[in-house]
């Protein structure tokens, strides 16, 4: 007999619902002082000893015997070779996914713009891609080629001159799909290094690894901690928490579908969070039964079970309007609207990393091949953050050109405001360009 699932049940009608929900959503990183200090030591070593430190750490942490950095560089030819080592079906899937990701992100490109005022003053914005971006890819046999596509393609669409990928190869293990994805995505350089040392190398540069402007990509607690420390020296995408899915369902979707949608995130790791919200209590019972029945069929059953029982929940609400309120409170990474008319509810969704519309739109499609990016804000940060995109690899500069007439008129306003702040240097700099003698006579120190 299968043991019933121990997934948590919550009811929005409970007077303590808000407190219980807050407890469910709470999550603390496992980073501790010892991890933090080790990361700081690694960063310091890479900054001081460059390639020598990278070789040393690779030998120590990845179990590789390498003589020099030359052994940790993959040429473009190796990426092209990977394309021949994967199956035709795998190559077709990678290329189709890449095509869809590229097509979607092309629509995110921002253009420079300007306008001219009546006196000839020109104001505008110049959009410029980053010079170089660094992509961290977790290594080993269980690495994720989809992450290569999702991180590298937006950078190339943005116009980044050089994308540098780092991927560890523990005990010499390398995933051919990852290298093939790098080839398809247009990655320019690849180094087989990982951990905090790889992040440090990208941020500060070594004799072999070029210094980048931004570091993106997922990693373990050492990688995340290193990204925190190098932020400011370089940009970063985000510090991601555990993966999350929230399904809002009206009770009319196949409960097996919903259970498997919850599993799709729960299988990532034990801290992943999978939540179902529905006004239909009987449907919640059906999904609980599906979870119990389907769990033993999962390859990662132990991980899924720990995640579902530890951080998962089935939440009963009064109606769909309250379900949307709960969704906005949670601000999930992935939100499935598994309802009859998702378009009707979409305007009320304020906080979600990605919104999957309708019963047939599983979150897994977004992870791999729908087109939008799968690098999404977690842990409630969808309240103020957005998915990774082309705009993360572009920056904006303000453009100001003043005609003589414009400088004279704007100078009057600048002078008054600058003197109000007791910044006479600012004021006089603007006043020198004012051509109205009457104004200058009455408003400047020397009347000139």
Swiss-Prot record:
Residues noted as binding Zn(2+) in the record, renumbered to the chain: 265, 268, 367, 426
Binding-site residues for NAD(+), renumbered to this chain: 136, 197, 220
Gene name linked to the record: hisD
Chain sites annotated for binding substrate: 243, 265, 268, 334, 367, 421, 426
Matching PROSITE patterns: HISOL_DEHYDROGENASE
Pathway as given in its UniProt record: Amino-acid biosynthesis; L-histidine biosynthesis; L-histidine from 5-phospho-alpha-D-ribose 1-diphosphate: step 9/9
UniProt cross-references to SUPFAM superfamilies, sorted A to Z: ALDH-like
Name by which UniProt lists this protein: Histidinol dehydrogenase
Species this chain originates from: Pseudomonas savastanoi pv. phaseolicola (strain 1448A / Race 6) (Pseudomonas syringae pv. phaseolicola (strain 1448A / Race 6))
BP GO annotations: L-histidine biosynthetic process
